[in-house]
Amino acid sequence: MKLHILAVGNKMPDWIKKGYTEYSQRMPKEAEMQLVEIKPEKRIGKKTEQLLQAESERIRIALPPGCHIVVLDESGKQATTVRLAELMTNWRESGRDVTFIIGGADGLHRDIKQIAHEKLALSTMTLPHGLARVLLAEQLYRAFSITRNHPYHRA
């Protein structure tokens, strides 16, 4: 199973890149994590709806075929790390890759939210989209470690 992360935004600060890389490199090949940065739309003279629509089209192009789509959204379902581990086991058993979608500064277009198989919330608080990458990568690693009885998770 591959874990794809499509994240709107590029030119992230080094601490974001390092944080994401720290956890993505810990993942074994059987649950490889791959980040694809989606270029954000330029704001000049455009309304939010236009920006989100343009980013939505880029996301659709980048979506791996046949994947299970999980949108990260503050209004999504709250899940504990143990629940995320259960979900990962289910996804792995389904034989499909999983794609997590993180919106940019303005969020995600409703069309992307509608094609999602699931909506999850990392927090009910609004998070900077760069930080969401790091938090997601850490939680995926932690959830995977639970499925393998690895001592990283000690709850």
Curated annotation (Swiss-Prot):
GO cellular component: cytoplasm
Keywords assigned by UniProt, alphabetized: Cytoplasm, Methyltransferase, rRNA processing, S-adenosyl-L-methionine, Transferase
Main localization category: cytoplasm
Binding site for S-adenosyl-L-methionine: L72, G103, L122, S123, T124, M125, T126, L127
Enzyme Commission designation: 2.1.1.177
GO molecular function: rRNA (pseudouridine-N3-)-methyltransferase activity
CDD domains: RlmH-like
Subcellular location: Cytoplasm
Pfam family, one: SPOUT_MTase
Top class in the EC scheme: transferase
PANTHER family the record matches: METHYLTRANSFERASE (PTHR33603), RIBOSOMAL RNA LARGE SUBUNIT METHYLTRANSFERASE H (PTHR33603:SF1)
Task performed by this protein: Specifically methylates the pseudouridine at position 1915 (m3Psi1915) in 23S rRNA.
Sequence similarity: Belongs to the RNA methyltransferase RlmH family.
Name of the protein described by the UniProt record: Ribosomal RNA large subunit methyltransferase H
Natural source organism: Nitrosomonas eutropha (strain DSM 101675 / C91 / Nm57)
Record lineage: Bacteria, Pseudomonadati, Pseudomonadota, Betaproteobacteria, Nitrosomonadales
